[in-house]
């Protein structure tokens, strides 16, 4: 667990990962060096796992987002299919899920034809995938990687 000061630091970093230690310190009434030490400890403990830039998929020519529900023939405990899926460039996320499907996979492609090629040539080439269903995103109403951290 993290204390209330670390929680505030993490909340501020989620809103703006480029915020300076000095700015965080001013807002929390702490020295920038103390903020730096706290952030380093959060990184060492694995609370902060990295710093990422948010990109506009549409402006990068990736107009189609889709979710793939996958059933595999993997043995219980084996994640061979998941690892193969995760190594495909168009795959952003792979989640092991409960229910009739094994994995939920988020994809980004240039267009529907590109999605079709991806499904046939890359995902279809994974022999342990028994069945998949694709849902194409029509409109994104919220896409935010921030976690709900309460003060």
Describe every region a protein language model picked out:
Residues 1-151:
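A compositional/biophysical signature of low hydrophobicity enriched in polar/charged and small residues
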């Amino acid at each position: 667990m993290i204390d209330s000061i670390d929680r505030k630091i993490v909340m501020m970093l989620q809103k703006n990962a480029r915020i300076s230690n000095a700015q965080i310190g001013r807002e929390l009434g702490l020295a920038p060096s103390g903020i730096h030490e706290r952030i380093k400890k959060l990184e060492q403990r694995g609370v902060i796992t990295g710093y990422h830039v948010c990109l506009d998929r549409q402006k990068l020519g990736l107009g189609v987002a889709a979710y793939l529900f996958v059933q595999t023939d993997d043995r219980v405990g084996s994640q061979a299919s998941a690892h193969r899926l995760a190594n495909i460039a168009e795959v952003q996320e792979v989640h092991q899920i409960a229910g009739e499907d094994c994995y939920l996979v988020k994809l980004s492609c240039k267009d529907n034809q590109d999605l079709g090629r991806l499904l046939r040539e890359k995902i279809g080439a994974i022999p342990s995938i028994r069945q998949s269903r694709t849902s194409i995103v029509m409109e994104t109403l919220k896409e935010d990687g921030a976690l709900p951290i309460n003060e």
